């Protein structure tokens, strides 16, 4: 039975991978220069600025835009094969370093959309430890578990390395971004101890009092970095206006936090909230749009 379950799990994961590629593949077929096919991961910040990019391109520049959610691996594959125009969320220099090294010859770095990322293990402020090296002394309070996200995420790979490096007596639990924040919500409501894989930017830091556990100086696996937008190799030639727009797109920490909280707290569709944010922050987006493109979109 265990073997059958493992086989079903493998087939299920393969099916999801094929489905993701199938959704992405062909997006760019028979679509013109005034089209954009953007891929993002189902993480709070990616959802926020990908939907923002969509409404700006549509409303201000007259584009036909398709956005597709996919796991990190299929997203890189899509732009490397030219089946999508851009992947909106590459974390460098650490989290996506392996993916970037694998695909860098077939993709183009369009620029930084957000500066100052931070990743690591996150706990509520009421948890009375401050360092990763203190986790084992309190493993029972955490039920010996670190609540993670989707398996293909770079933060999951690094956390597995960290468990070995610090010799932690913990299991890394695979879930998803939304499942992780739900677990965090339940724990905080009851003031239970919980440790999760966390990153900034993320709306959870605006909702709850949280802290990153400190790394030992000789065991630093996470560094601060930036979020880049990666494009297909020929994007600047085939769609120069789109490439220029994506290269100029940039959000500060307060701007992105404001957008993420607005999306998370609203019952409206993400696109509707992003459009309202765009209308309320015209001064932010004007810098991204060429004057002639802005006129064409009006």
Model features per residue range: what roles?
Residues 22-26:
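C-terminal motif of bacterial Sec signal peptides marking the signal peptidase cleavage site
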Residues 32-45, 63-68, 143-147, 246:
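Short, well-ordered beta-strand elements
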Residues 50, 70-104, 182-183, 203-208:
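Pocket-flanking alpha-helical
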Residues 45-48, 161-170, 175-189, 226, ...:
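An extracytoplasmic/periplasmic, membrane-proximal ligand-sensing/linker region
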């Amino acid at each position: 039975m265990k073997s059958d379950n493992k086989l079903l799990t493998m087939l299920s994961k393969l099916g999801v991978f094929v489905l993701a590629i199938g959704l992405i593949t062909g997006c760019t077929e028979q679509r013109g220069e005034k089209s954009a096919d953007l891929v993002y991961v189902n993480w709070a910040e990616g959802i926020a600025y990908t939907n923002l990019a969509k409404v700006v391109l549509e409303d201000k520049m007259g584009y036909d835009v398709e956005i597709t959610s996919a796991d990190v691996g299929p997203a890189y594959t899509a732009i490397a094969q030219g089946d999508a125009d851009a992947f909106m969320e590459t974390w460098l220099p650490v989290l996506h370093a392996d993916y970037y090294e694998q695909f860098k010859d077939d993709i183009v770095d369009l620029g930084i959309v957000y500066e100052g990322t931070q990743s690591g293990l996150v706990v509520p402020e009421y948890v009375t430890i401050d360092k990763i090296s203190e986790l084992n002394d309190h493993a029972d309070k955490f039920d010996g578990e670190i609540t993670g996200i989707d398996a293909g995420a770079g933060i999951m790979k690094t956390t597995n390395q960290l468990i070995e490096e610090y010799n932690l007596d913990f299991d890394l639990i695979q879930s998803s971004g939304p499942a992780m924040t739900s677990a965090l919500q339940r724990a905080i409501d009851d003031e239970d101890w919980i440790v999760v894989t966390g990153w900034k930017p993320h709306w959870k830091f605006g909702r709850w009092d949280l802290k990153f556990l400190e790394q030992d100086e000789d065991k630093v696996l996470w560094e601060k970095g930036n979020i880049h937008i990666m494009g297909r190799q020929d994007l600047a030639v085939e769609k120069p206006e789109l490439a220029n727009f994506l290269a100029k797109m940039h959000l500060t920490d307060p701007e992105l936090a404001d957008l993420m909280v607005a999306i998370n707290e609203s019952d409206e569709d993400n696109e509707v909230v992003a459009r309202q944010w765009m209308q309320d922050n015209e001064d932010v987006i004007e810098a991204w749009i060429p004057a002639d493109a802005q006129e064409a979109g009006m």
